[in-house]
């Protein structure tokens, strides 16, 4: 059975899973589904058509699933879908999608730190860290194991590649390639995210191949398709390199140089 504080306001149609803890002054809307073992400390608002998995933890004043800030919103049913074992620190905001039938989606094992904002239609993978006051604008895609530094802001429709890292206060207006370290305003690709690769168990062989790809793509003055051709010809085609190439080839906003 869930443990619910008497001051919490929960709609009778909401679904609250077993072993959930709902603290003082939380508000849970009609179309919310909480899986098992979620912990809501106090003053949490979860609203809209929101589906949340198991084992998530919400700290005071987090707001999840509420109506988008996007002025293009015209009504309809929009969704917020969240996986398992995520942490939402104080004053985090996660907004629902804009278009009818669309969703803001988050995977599992993510850490969303205090005052961060996840806007409408964001697709956020697994094992992501969004540091304090980090901002993801609408339709941003964040791949697994990416880290967004404190006060960093990501423009709408940008993508952050797997195991990439943004320095604090970075302003991102184009895609950030996988495995790269990006910093500054305007943002620049500074180096390979060596520490991130090591922490996530990337092999030495793959790390060396990623460094080769980085040097050819960012440091040799090659442009676009020419850089991709050279990397395919000169760098071992390991899965990490293929992912890097697939990412940069499909970029619509360009890659942060």
Predicted regions and their residues:
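Structural signal for interior beta-strand "rungs" in well-ordered beta-sheet cores
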Residues: 3-183, 187-188
């Amino acid at each position: 059975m869930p443990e619910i504080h008497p001051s919490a306001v929960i709609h009778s149609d909401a679904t609250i899973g077993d072993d959930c803890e709902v603290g003082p002054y939380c508000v849970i809307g009609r179309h919310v589904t909480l899986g098992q073992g979620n912990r809501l400390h106090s003053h949490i608002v979860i609203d809209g058509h929101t589906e949340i998995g198991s084992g998530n933890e919400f700290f005071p004043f987090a707001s999840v699933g509420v109506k988008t800030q996007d002025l293009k919103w015209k009504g309809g049913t929009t969704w917020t879908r969240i996986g398992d074992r995520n942490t939402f620190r104080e004053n985090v905001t996660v907004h629902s999608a804009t278009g009818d039938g669309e969703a803001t989606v988050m995977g599992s094992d993510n850490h969303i730190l205090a005052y961060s904002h996840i806007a409408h239609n964001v697709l956020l993978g697994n094992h992501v860290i969004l540091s304090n006051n980090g901002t993801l604008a609408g339709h941003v895609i964040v791949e697994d194991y990416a880290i967004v530094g404190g006060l960093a802001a990501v423009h709408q429709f940008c993508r952050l590649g797997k195991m990439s890292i943004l320095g604090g206060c970075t302003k991102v207006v184009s895609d950030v390639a996988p495995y790269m370290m990006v910093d500054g305003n305007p943002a620049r690709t500074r180096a390979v995210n060596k520490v991130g690769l090591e922490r996530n168990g990337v092999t030495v062989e793959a790390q060396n191949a990623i460094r080769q790809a980085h040097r050819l793509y960012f440091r040799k003055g090659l442009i676009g398709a020419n850089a991709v051709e050279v990397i395919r010809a000169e760098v071992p085609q390991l899965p990490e390199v293929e992912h890097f190439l697939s990412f940069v080839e499909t970029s619509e906003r360009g890659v942060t140089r």
